[in-house]
A protein has these predicted regions:
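Hydrophobic transmembrane signal anchors and adjacent membrane-proximal interface regions, especially
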Residues: 6-7, 170
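Extracellular and organelle-lumenal recognition/adhesion modules and their flexible linkers in secreted
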Residues: 16-189
């Protein structure tokens, strides 16, 4: 009888492993991993942890020192958005994020590498959090060249994004701005 239980347990574990292996797919191009510790992260499509039913993109800390960050990124031409306000929205979920996670977007221009930037560090998602709606809104200047956007994971843990959208919005929608660093009032010598 014990032998039968052991065989049943082994079969169940094998079945779970097969289901887990089948639930993760490759990350579709043009998405890629970036960041100062990009090689410490893995990314793909998770068909289990999804709310759209189409699979959620994930970014998971896999190895290395628990320092720096990884980011799941897509870069597009700014050409069709010149002079407009754009918003990147997604549902986001985290598990065991050691530092913080959030959506981000950057606009580069001919004369300025960082024409506009926001990374959600002032509205961090930490630890384990259920699905929640987040967005980033920026203006694209007339000389814009590229728009980069995605999700950042600073530290260990895993983050998922699903139900993504990228759209032009009206000027009534406020732009996200990074908080200004407080500068000293006088020099420290």
């Amino acid at each position: 009888m014990k032998t039968l239980h052991v065989i049943a347990a082994a079969a169940a574990a094998t079945s779970l492993w097969v289901v887990a292996a089948e639930s993760v797919g490759k990350l579709p191009p043009p998405w890629f991993i970036s960041g100062d510790h990009a090689t410490s992260y893995q990314a793909g499509i998770d068909n289990v942890e999804t709310i759209s039913g189409k699979g959620a993109k994930f970014l998971r800390y896999a190895q290395g020192e628990d320092k720096g960050f990884g980011s799941l990124v897509q870069v597009i031409s700014a050409q069709r958005y010149l002079g407009q306000r754009v918003r990147f929205r997604a549902m986001i979920k985290t598990r065991d994020v050691s530092n913080w996670a959030g959506l981000w977007m950057q606009v580069q221009a001919q004369q300025r590498q960082n024409a506009a930037f926001y990374n959600s560090s002032d509205q961090p998602i930490k630890g384990t959090a259920a699905w929640q709606a987040r967005s980033v809104t920026l203006d694209v200047p007339e000389d814009g060249t590229t728009i980069s956007f995605g999700v950042i994971n600073a530290g260990s843990g895993q983050v998922w994004i699903d139900q993504l959208s990228f759209e032009v919005v009206g000027k009534i929608v406020p732009v996200d701005v990074m908080p200004a660093a407080r500068l000293p009032e006088k020099p420290v010598l």
